[in-house]
């Protein structure tokens, strides 16, 4: 399935139904009086976070969503029915913005969370509503009020516990494939990864979600390469795993390049706990490895892990370090994976793989009864 993390959609809630002008007509009742009912309220437009989705690709093919109008009022004081609602199903982690792309309407971070982004118009009053002591037979009614019509943006930020960052070909996708059942595209050329990938890793019986994003290069915050937009998918993570390839001629510079892009992106990414690892150590000799380890340690101010996703060297230690930070960030308790956890096992490491309203599902029945 193709990945799409941003979509522009046009929504319109239903217009309210018109009130009815009607008079009671029965045998032997000469002056029955008005009995026109009120019009029904127009349908609402909702967005709802559901599991099982990790892309907004469906909104590439359908961008217009319109709720139905309320039914008009009828005689005998019969009110019109409410128009049918429209619900946009989106992945957990989707943010809804106004047309300016800056004003946040809501952030759907839990399964079943719903938000009303456009309220239906109220139905008009029937002529029975206007009956008074001075006007016993009003012959007018109100039209229904129009619904809301606007453009909104959907922006997906994947929910994961740990995020992988680094230059292109730093071994991020290989790492993800080695410790989870994710199967990202892996090749020996830059920008093999063009969209984020998720996988569930297990270490010592505990699970957490890893997010792999496309590589960053110098100037990514200015649009160089494929830019830095995908960094939004690691904003929600508890920890970043920064991979630097041992094949880089200057590993210290490679580390600082990515660090600079994280700072330029902002949103407190540089404030997150960071684990630094020198990857692909199986392709360099021992003397070169020692030299690059010292250089990277000077650049990042800490001792980097040494790992190889091919031989499995150092992988368990890195996973445990990630797990420990995630557990600590969640109050010291075991973390339940933010996505539905899959039962996975490691590959053999020794082998060579405000108009709106929000609600949860638990509140939905109460709201419908009140409506």
From Swiss-Prot:
Subcellular location: Cytoplasm
Record-level GO cellular component terms: cytoplasm
Biased composition (Acidic residues): 356-371
CDD domains: Obg
Domain Obg: 1-159
A Pfam cross-reference name: MMR_HSR1
GO molecular function terms noted in the UniProt entry: GTP binding; GTPase activity; magnesium ion binding
Keywords: Cytoplasm, GTP-binding, Hydrolase, Magnesium, Metal-binding, Nucleotide-binding
Keyword presence, Glycoprotein: no
Cited function: An essential GTPase which binds GTP, GDP and possibly (p)ppGpp with moderate affinity, with high nucleotide exchange rates and a fairly low GTP hydrolysis rate. Plays a role in control of the cell cycle, stress response, ribosome biogenesis and in those bacteria that undergo differentiation, in morphogenesis control.
HAMAP family from the UniProt entry: GTPase_Obg
Family: Belongs to the TRAFAC class OBG-HflX-like GTPase superfamily. OBG GTPase family.
Name this polypeptide is given: GTPase Obg
Native species: Rhizobium rhizogenes (strain K84 / ATCC BAA-868) (Agrobacterium radiobacter)
Classification lineage: Bacteria, Pseudomonadati, Pseudomonadota, Alphaproteobacteria, Hyphomicrobiales
């Amino acid at each position: 399935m193709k990945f799409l993390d941003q979509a522009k959609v046009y929504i319109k809630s239903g217009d309210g139904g018109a009130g009815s002008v009607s008079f009671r007509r029965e045998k032997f009742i000469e002056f029955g009086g008005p009995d026109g009912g009120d019009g029904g309220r127009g349908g609402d437009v909702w967005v709802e976070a559901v599991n099982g989705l990790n892309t907004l690709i469906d909104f590439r093919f359908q961008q217009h969503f319109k709720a139905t109008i309320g039914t008009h009022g009828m005689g005998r004081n019969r009110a019109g029915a409410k128009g049918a609602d429209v619900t946009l199903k989106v992945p957990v982690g989707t943010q809804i913005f106004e047309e300016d792309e800056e004003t946040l309407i809501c952030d759907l971070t839990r399964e079943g969370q719903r938000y009303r982004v456009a309220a239906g118009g109220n139905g008009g009053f029937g002529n029975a509503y206007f009956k008074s002591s001075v006007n016993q037979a009003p012959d007018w009614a109100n039209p229904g009020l129009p619904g809301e019509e606007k453009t909104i943006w959907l922006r997906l930020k994947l929910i994961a516990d740990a995020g992988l960052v680094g230059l292109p070909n730093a071994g991020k996708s290989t790492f993800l494939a080695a410790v989870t059942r994710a199967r990202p595209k892996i090749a020996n050329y830059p920008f093999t990864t063009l969209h984020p990938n998720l996988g569930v890793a297990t270490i010592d019986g505990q699970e957490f979600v890893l997010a792999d994003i496309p590589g960053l290069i110098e100037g990514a915050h200015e649009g160089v390469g494929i830019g830095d937009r995908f960094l939004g998918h690691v904003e929600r993570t508890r920890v970043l795993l920064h991979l630097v390839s041992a094949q880089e001629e200057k590993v210290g510079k490679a580390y600082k390049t990515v660090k600079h892009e994280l700072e330029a992106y902002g949103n407190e990414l540089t404030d997150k706990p960071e684990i630094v690892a020198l990857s692909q150590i199986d392709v360099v000799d021992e003397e070169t490895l020692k030299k690059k380890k010292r250089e990277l340690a000077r650049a990042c101010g800490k001792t980097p892990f040494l790992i190889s996703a091919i031989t499995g060297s150092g992988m368990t230690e890195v996973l445990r370090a990630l797990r420990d930070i995630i557990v600590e960030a969640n109050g010291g308790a075991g973390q339940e994976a933010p996505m539905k956890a899959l039962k996975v096992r490691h590959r053999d490491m020794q082998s060579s793989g405000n108009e709106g309203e929000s609600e949860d599902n638990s509140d939905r029945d109460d709201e419908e009864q009140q409506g």
